[in-house]
Amino acid sequence: MGRADKVVLAYSGGVDTSVCIPYLKNEWGVKEVITLAADLGQGDELGPIQAKALRCGAVESLVTNAQEEFVTEYAFRAIKANALYENRYPLSTALARPLIAKLLVEAAEKYGADAVAHGCTAKGNDQVRFDLGILALNPNLKVLAPAREWNMSREETIAYGERCGVESPVKKSSPFSIDRNLLGRSIEAGPLEDPMTEPPEEIYLMTKAIADTPDTPEYVDIGFEKGIPVSLNGQTLDPVSLISQLNEKVGNHGVGRLDMIENRVVGIKSREIYEAPALLVLIDAHRDLESLTLTADVTQYKHGVGDTYSQLIYRGLWYSPLKTALDALIDQTQERVTGMVRVKLFKGNAVIVGRQSENSIYSANLSTYGSDDAFDHKAAEGFIYIWGLPTRVWAQKTK
């Protein structure tokens, strides 16, 4: 008896998920494999994917366009939270996983599958994100992870696929593992596993090398409504177009690259290369607008909220009660975060040079050092006396 009768497989068209199709059928006795590919802005990669899945042995190949949902329900929530994992990574790849898990569960329920499957390995983060997401949405579904159990190297996986008629889109001389969606790209493996190896320029597609960027700066005005980016240079755009256009503008100036050592969920350190031009600039601009419109205590408290939020996303806990509770808190803080932030793009830098909001709590009369200063200077001495009282008492008692 096989491990399942009908399986919905998360499908990317790459080596691992393509090999999963014959492996599930030949090794685990699965009768029917339905593949599901989520169109999250990968571009031309999804063109031949349906035909390839069928050639690999799938009985049906589904492609779901979820770009708008990806941006509005996942990316925009991360932006409102200022979510940067380990203060650097904007979670461009991680944000896609809970959405794919949701689509897998919906397809399994629609087609009467008793299991879902993915091609994640035992050392990666995505296995955790998929498994926990599926578990949270439908605990009755089995989760199959062939690549976690088959104990094959990448070369052996490619060879197994070739024996089963699976063509590989990756040349054996090109060892990089790449994931792409509308928000960005992640590149790992091969020579990049040496932390001292400089990434070759050819791995980058969304961002230009500094030497190839324009010699004049470009200014971009980013408009926000209640924490959500809605316009570029005064033009209101739909969510997908806004991300796409900003990716192009920002990447054209060499902004949006990350080269970092990150701590994976499973406890190992991994060297990762990321491109996320729009997402990085949007988080920076959003955080700046918050500084103009929110009180100091709310702004400071949100630093911790953003850190926790980023860890929940990274560790596969998108559908957790804590994340739901944090969403409610974040949404309340964003009621005032409406306005515009001006960003200067030039030679690998994105510098915020201006901001404005009808909800600004910045007071020029209080901040100025000019003649129209409205600050009561005489009040400072009394304030310092009260504020410093604990320090004074401590010093008196301990010196």
Curated annotation (Swiss-Prot):
GO terms for biological process: argininosuccinate metabolic process; L-arginine biosynthetic process; urea cycle. It is found in: Cytoplasm. It catalyses: L-citrulline + L-aspartate + ATP = 2-(N(omega)-L-arginino)succinate + AMP + diphosphate + H(+). L-aspartate binds at T121, N125, D126. One of its GO terms (molecular function) is argininosuccinate synthase activity. L-citrulline binds at Y89, N125, R129, S177, S186, E262, Y274. PANTHER family: ARGININOSUCCINATE SYNTHASE. This is Argininosuccinate synthase.
